[in-house]
A protein has these predicted regions:
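Subset of outer-membrane beta-barrel
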Residues: 20-336
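Sec-dependent N-terminal signal peptides
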Residues: 4-13
């Protein structure tokens, strides 16, 4: 019964062409470039590599929702006198969902330029040209015209015409990002972004339904007392895309295991953090983030609270993130 309920829900979403397949991560604050091109290059170090995996609805479907992503960003043309830089990044995503194996592939390039608007306060504007493709398989789906009165006969014509074109479509995202360092212990960030400025076609059936533009507001910070090993990091994100909207808010408690070097200037701080977040009306999730100098590993688990929780027993999905940061000045010093 649970699988039937889920299949009906997935089928309705599929037919209406409103399956907004924009990837989203619970630990959105760990990779801000993926939600806002304006945040490209805002990290300690010179090069940042990020990979992520998210699995949802495994408890009610043999074909759960899986998202895999990878990204790299860096900053060039750095001017230390005014703290300006040009940020460059690339992102790749693969998303598969449901019995139809609805697949979305995305590749985009992030470009931004950051300027200092006051001492230790920076503002950046970014754009993100994007290419994506979306396709699905009809073989595992059943339709109303295949219902015989007691069962579905997949040998019957389904009466639907699926668009099988796998060519890439072009789109553009944009965003504005602010980062402020209040002192050595405290910092804040805030951003707004608009995705799908070109509103490309979204439906896989005959029709002219386009993808809604997506508006996102996000912010956060990190705060601690001087000399304290404990910090807290509140974060929030809100987005609206057509009739869909979501608000996530929560906090990470960060414990410092090792401080940054005061002599090399390299960010080799090691921390462990535990967080709890609420996605209003949808899920509660917890996070664990381990940061050991250049390497970071994050894990989160969603507990479903929406109407679908009757079928899921509250089991939403797991997420894993891996991040690696490179400091070229440290590498050069080590080679001397």
């Amino acid at each position: 019964m649970r699988k039937l309920a889920f299949s009906i829900l997935a089928l309705i979403i599929f037919i209406n062409g409103q399956a907004q397949q924009d990837r989203h991560y619970s630990m959105f604050y760990a990779a801000p470039m993926t939600i806002n091109p304006g945040a490209t290059g805002f990290f300690p170090g010179d090069i940042q590599v990020f990979t992520g995996f998210k699995n949802q609805w495994k408890s009610i479907s043999s074909n759960p929702y899986n998202t895999i992503s990878a990204s790299l960003d860096t900053k060039v043309m750095k001017n230390k006198s005014n703290n300006s830089f040009l940020g460059l990044g690339v992102n790749f995503y693969n998303d598969k969902s449901g019995d139809s194996q609805l697949t979305t592939n995305i590749a985009n390039i992030s470009i931004n330029y950051a300027i200092e608007i006051a001492d230790n306060h920076q503002l950046a504007l970014g754009v993100q040209p994007s290419f994506f493709q979306r396709f699905a398989s009809m073989e595992s789906l059943t339709w109303d015209q295949q219902w015989t009165g007691s069962t579905f006969d997949t040998n019957l014509e389904n009466g639907e015409t699926l668009i099988t074109d796998k060519s890439f479509q072009f789109d553009i995202n944009s965003g504005l990002y602010y980062f402020g360092k209040l002192n050595n212990q405290n910092s804040i960030n805030f951003g707004v972004s608009v995705a799908h400025l070109l509103t490309p076609q979204n439906t896989l059936l005959n029709g002219n339904e386009n993808l809604y533009q997506k508006y996102t507001i996000h912010g956060g910070g990190e705060f601690s007392k001087n000399g304290s090993k404990l910090a807290f990091s509140p974060n929030l994100i809100y987005f609206k895309q057509g009739p869909n909207q979501s608000l996530s808010i929560g906090n990470d408690f960060i414990y410092s295991l090792k401080e940054s070097s005061k002599y090399t200037g390299y960010y080799d701080k090691s921390t462990i953090s535990l967080g709890s977040y609420l996605r209003i009306g949808d899920a509660f999730y917890t996070t664990l983030f381990l940061n050991f100098a250049e390497f970071s590993l994050g894990v989160s688990y969603d507990l479903n609270m929406s109407g679908l929780s009757v079928a899921t027993d509250g089991r939403g999905g797991m997420e894993m993130l891996l991040r690696y940061r490179i400091n070229l000045s440290k590498s050069a010093a080590a080679s001397l």
